[in-house]
Amino acid sequence: MIKPTTDYADLEGCDLIIEAVLEDPKVKADVTQKTQAVVPEGCIYGSNTSTLPISMLAKASQDESKFIGIHFFSPVDKMPLVEIIMGKNTGEEALAKALDYVRQIRKTPIVVNDSRGFYTSRCFMTYPVEATNMLHEGIAPALIENSGVYAGMAVGPFAVLDEVSLELSYHIAEATKKALGDAYKSEACDEVVTRLYADLGRKGKKNRKGFYEY
């Protein structure tokens, strides 16, 4: 049985948890600790994150061997791929249970090792990032958006960011800046996303206004 919930009491007796909260290490650590206070000892803990290193998030866990990344893609009901991320100390039992679960819900798993952004975000995010850099340079947004579609992408780069949510993109960038410090390479897209989300309150599709209005 699969049950979505925000009530920790509902987690008692579960054998697999998939957490999907804000991309903020402190928030995720707090949820991890509160969850593990009520679940059975052998429960596998999956974190749905697109960029935060699993080995880092697992430090908040009571048993790092039971901690694994299970990354779904937006929109979840349409996207078949699920990225399963092995942390430094993730055990084979956690991997087996994650693979079994993903196959049961008829999605396609890929297993990757731990690295910031993993496989999919490191590769795919160049698409909306470079598009937003071009927007900052003054290139017409319609030209950028249509070029992506004409090149064969399912939707344009700005539609992608609205679907994923500008709020999420902003918090990912902030968490990455904090983690990397001086090693973080700021791009023009950071300024654009900050302007849209932090200054104008445009979160994307979730509040019906992002690059587009819905």
Model region roles, listed by residue range:
Residues 1-214:
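N-terminal glycine-rich phosphate-binding loop for ADP-containing cofactors
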